Amino acid sequence: MRLLLICNYRPGVGGISGQVEIMQKKLREENHTADIFSTKGSFFWRLGLFHRLRKVARDYDVLHIHCCSGWGFLPAVVGVTVGRKMKKRVVLTYHGGGGETFFDKHPKLVHHYLTRTNTNIVLSGFLAKIFDKHQLPYTIIPNIIELDDTLFRQRNVLKPHFICTRAHEPLYNIPCILRAFQKTLTELPESTLTLVGDGSQHGALMQMAEDMGVKNVTFTGRVDNSEIYRYLNESDILLSSPTIDNMPVSLLEAMNAGLLVISSRVGGVPYMIKNGNNGLLFESNNHDELAKKMLWAIENQAVAMTIIQQAHRAVKQYRWESVKDQFYSIYGIHS
């Protein structure tokens, strides 16, 4: 089978691009042709996307589009239009936590393209409810993660070494983490916080930390996705505080590496994490509650360790082998 994966692709950044890279690797390992067509580029470069995709797509059986809201919907516009015209099998995976706002704002646009695919895939029950609301067809297949037991580190003692691997963009609400960490430092002055990544707020966040006088904070700058596990291995607790989200792979990576995950209770996250079972949840933008969860984790080591073990077991459902048959059925591959 020859498959073309279409998205706003950038190598080494994780997110949607990371998912596409994993899919390409797994499909190639099973002797299928799997290539990536990126719709990312300047405005003028994107004007030629339809023509370029028509030339490329003729050599493929399936177009698998990965899209989200805003400009992230461009792969759907280009991929569905070309795929339908060329009578290709068109599969679309919708990512991102901003789907509800985008669908409500652009119902005709969304309906036009998402009713012209062969199959729509959503990652969790969170997006499934939005698709139901707009009477759009879908099937649920979660994000996938490459599991490797060598990446898991058993921690005998949970230390107050915190990490966040989310991009420094407004929707990820890193200021909430800085405020919570400042409160944690008053109780646990040996605490450390590593903020991995960059983004439009990177400079402002560094300035905020300086203005607040927060100590023991490390800003790494941009890190290639292949290096993420090195930073996770040096930490014990992952913090995530977005105001909107869907099914973040960063949380799965942390569970896979043996960290305790503390996340805001938004979007699709509660479909992944059950509070007190395989992670801890707090109300969005509530840095006081986040700080309490951070302190609780250090003060309740035995329970926290049990949560980590349960999370590590739960993450196995997101491996390629668990969802491969669903993808093969959708692609029309007979294994």
Task: Show the residue positions of the predicted features.
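Conserved donor-binding/catalytic core segment of Leloir-type glycosyltransferases
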Residues: 4-5, 153-185, 193-198
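Donor nucleotide-sugar binding/catalytic pocket of nucleotide-sugar-dependent glycosyltransferases
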Residues: 115-151, 220
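Nucleotide-activated donor-binding/catalytic signature segment of Leloir-type glycosyltransferases, i.e.
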Residues: 206-223
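Short alpha-helical donor nucleotide-sugar binding micro-motif in glycosyltransferases
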Residues: 222-223, 230-235
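Aromatic "clamp/platform" in nucleotide-sugar-dependent glycosyltransferases that forms part
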Residues: 243
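Short hydrophobic beta-strand element within catalytic cores of glycosyltransferases
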Residues: 260-263
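Conserved acidic donor-binding segment of nucleotide-sugar-dependent glycosyltransferases
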Residues: 275-276, 280-287, 296-302
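A short, well-ordered alpha-helix in the C-terminal region of glycosyltransferases
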Residues: 289, 296, 303-317, 329
